[in-house]
């Protein structure tokens, strides 16, 4: 029995029926013995609309009777400047000072010797 001060919330489905898909587990043949292994194939424009564009990394969680697919966000590409900075960090201390002096000269904060 519920508490006298509680209000029952209507239960709404997390996914609308229009977004439900029905699939059947089929099989794929495995070489060299051609044994049949279970297979599920997903394809359709709805995948991209759901955030699964071609090339998207997908995290797969498997539980008894349940498979959860989660699209992984694309890693932000590092800017060309940051890539160059990483290269400079691998140089010797003398070459790093030369790069710093060069930056000082082109920004006008340091005089040419």
Swiss-Prot record:
GO biological process per UniProt: RNA metabolic process
Keyword annotations: Cytoplasm, DNA-binding, Endonuclease, Hydrolase, Nuclease, RNA-binding
Pfam families cross-referenced by the UniProt entry: SymE_toxin
Keyword Nuclease: yes
This protein's GO CC annotations: cytoplasm
Subcellular locations according to the entry: Cytoplasm
Keyword presence, DNA-binding: yes
A single GO molecular function term of this UniProt record: RNA endonuclease activity
InterPro entries the UniProt entry points to: SpoVT-AbrB_dom, Toxin_SymE-like, TypeI_TA_SymE
EC number: 3.1.-.-
Function text: Involved in the degradation and recycling of damaged RNA. It is itself a target for degradation by the ATP-dependent protease Lon.
Protein family membership: Belongs to the SymE family.
HAMAP family, per database record: Endoribonucl_SymE (MF_01193)
Full protein name: Endoribonuclease SymE
Species this protein is from: Shigella flexneri
Lineage, opening ranks: Bacteria, Pseudomonadati, Pseudomonadota, Gammaproteobacteria, Enterobacterales
């Amino acid at each position: 029995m519920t508490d006298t001060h509680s209000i029952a919330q209507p239960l709404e489905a997390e996914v609308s029926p229009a977004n439900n898909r029905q699939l059947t587990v089929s099989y794929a043949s495995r070489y060299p013995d051609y044994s049949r292994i279970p297979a599920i194939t997903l394809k359709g424009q709805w995948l991209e609309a759901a955030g699964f564009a071609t090339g998207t990394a997908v995290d797969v969680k498997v539980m008894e009777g349940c498979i959860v697919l989660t699209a992984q966000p694309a890693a932000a590409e590092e800017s060309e400047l940051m890539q160059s900075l990483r290269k400079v960090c691998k140089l010797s201390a003398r070459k790093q000072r030369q790069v710093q002096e060069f930056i000082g000269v082109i920004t006008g904060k340091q005089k040419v010797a």
